[in-house]
Amino acid sequence: MHPKQICADIEMLGARLVLDGNDLYIENPENVYQELVEFVQSYKKRIIRYLKGEYSDQEHNVKQTIDKIINYYMGVAQDLNKKIDDWFNHDYESVMKVMKLLVLFWENGWRDLDTSVSNFESEETDKLSLEIYERAMSYFKGDKS
């Protein structure tokens, strides 16, 4: 989910996400239910980058693609699972890159597999994520080699 949407959803509840240096606070937290607070915490790093103006649409496209690939592996029903399955059946190298990426997230502390990898991203995972994204876009745009 785009951090912009998360911020908008919080504001609809009469609260606001506020940046204080490198930390994130919820103004009027009494207006936000606990599950949403936990959801916000799971996307904290991305939200902070967004509020600082450092989160581009291109970066979001890459991260959203990785989120969808992780959902695919977790067995989450998505419209594009068949497309991802087809891609992986034709692109072994991408499968290996995704496996390496998942190991990196694990090494960075990602243990609750039902939460976003957002807080476990690093320069190394960002670089590998971009490589995977570019391979996916190339495949889905017709270069199936």
Predicted feature locations:
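Eukaryotic low-complexity, mixed-charge intrinsically disordered interaction/regulatory segments enriched
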Residues: 9-33
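Phosphate/adenylate-binding glycine loop and adjacent helical scaffold
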Residues: 4-7, 23, 33, 39, ...
